[in-house]
């Protein structure tokens, strides 16, 4: 498999104090990987470390075979995009302008959109199903619509890797299904690699190729949803969920 991200003996945390240690994982091109675990377990810290928002306590993160720290911010922005729970500082921006900001790695902050950029922006709006919202102010949208805008912005960035932090948050059930189908299309048809976090166990089990499980005072566990269920590992990370319920989710 073609590894796009790999960690070696990675320890993550803040102020030199490790929250998780000995993380040795990899992301393969075209995979959908789910990051799961309770609040406070280290999901956000791992996300921030893999995206160079914070530095590792120790160890290494490799991106496309190079140390992550060797890339400039612009170089990183052409390789991975982010869908975070944070929203734009200027809530009065139009949807079109926010999605167009995804093109900045290719045009610079002061440059104008070229025809190709506009085409990609409009295609991204259409892919997520929000073309009709293009001229709306972001502040006027529902929470679910705002989430779709941020996903469209990541698509406009046109990167081989997409990180999504709670992408299904605020989405109603039909929109969740749309998101799932979109993630599958991006993975299978365009070869996008997607790492997403979620508290939605059905989403995690049913639609990911691989899961990374984190929990306080436990080592990170990696495996396919079926492997983690069959081995009883899911029960240790999601104790309120019975084995019968778990099997019903993935069958």
Where do the language-model regions lie?
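Helix-to-loop junction immediately C-terminal to a conserved catalytic motif
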Residues: 51
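Catalytic Walker B motif of ABC-type/P-loop ATPase nucleotide-binding domains
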Residues: 162-165
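ABC ATPase nucleotide-binding domains
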Residues: 238-251
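The feature captures the beta-strand-to-loop junction immediately N-terminal to the Walker
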Residues: 36-38
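H-loop/switch region of ABC-family ATPase nucleotide-binding domains
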Residues: 198-199
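Conserved ABC transporter NBD signature motif
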Residues: 59-67
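Conserved ABC ATPase signature
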Residues: 137-141
């Amino acid at each position: 498999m073609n590894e796009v991200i790999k960690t070696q003996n990675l320890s993550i945390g803040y102020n030199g104090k490790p929250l998780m240690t000995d993380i040795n994982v990899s992301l393969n091109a075209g995979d959908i990987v789910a990051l799961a675990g309770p609040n406070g377990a280290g999901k956000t810290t791992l996300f921030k470390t893999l995206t160079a928002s914070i530095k590792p306590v120790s160890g290494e993160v490799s991106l496309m075979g190079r140390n992550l720290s060797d890339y400039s911010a612009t170089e990183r922005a052409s390789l991975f995009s982010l869908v975070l729970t944070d929203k734009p500082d200027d809530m009065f921006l139009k949807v079109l302008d926010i999605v167009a900001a995804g093109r900045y790695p290719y045009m610079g902050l002061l440059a104008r959109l070229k025809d190709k950029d506009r085409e990609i922006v409009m295609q991204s709006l259409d892919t997520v199903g929000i073309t009709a919202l293009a001229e709306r102010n972001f502040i006027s949208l529902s929470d679910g619509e705002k989430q779709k805008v941020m996903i469209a912005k990541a698509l406009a960035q046109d990167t081989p890797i997409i990180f999504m932090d709670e992408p299904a948050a605020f989405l109603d059930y039909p929109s969740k299904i749309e998101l799932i189908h979109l993630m599958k299309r991006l993975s299978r048809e365009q070869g996008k690699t997607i790492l997403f976090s979620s508290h939605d166990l059905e989403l995690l089990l049913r639609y990911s190729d691989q899961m990374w499980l984190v929990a306080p005072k436990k080592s990170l566990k990696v495996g396919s949803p079926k492997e983690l269920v069959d081995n009883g590992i899911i029960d240790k990370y999601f104790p309120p969920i019975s084995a019968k319920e778990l099997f019903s989710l993935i069958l």
